[in-house]
């Protein structure tokens, strides 16, 4: 069954140009998510943790 599906997928006629475009879009989405979500959240967590230091 798996071989049949693989053969069907490989003979579907997908072009390498479409695959490259999709890969570039995926990497761009990861970078945008990092810039818009992860970096500000990390900066906010670091800022809060520095402001709320424990006194020992």
UniProtKB/Swiss-Prot annotation:
Function recorded in the entry: Involved in the binding and/or turnover of quinones at the Q(B) site of Photosystem II.
GO cellular component labels: photosystem II; plasma membrane-derived thylakoid membrane
Subcellular location: Cellular thylakoid membrane
Superkingdom field: Bacteria
Spans through the membrane: 27-47
Family membership: Belongs to the PsbX family. Type 2 subfamily.
Membrane disposition: Single-pass membrane protein
Originating gene: psbX
Name this protein carries in UniProt: Photosystem II reaction center X protein
Gene Ontology biological-process entries: photosynthesis
């Amino acid at each position: 069954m798996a071989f049949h599906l693989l053969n069907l997928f490989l003979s579907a006629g997908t072009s390498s140009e479409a695959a490259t475009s999709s890969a570039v879009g995926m990497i761009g989405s990861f970078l945008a998510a990092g810039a818009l979500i992860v970096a500000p959240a990390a900066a906010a967590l670091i800022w809060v943790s520095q402001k709320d230091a424990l006194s020992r």
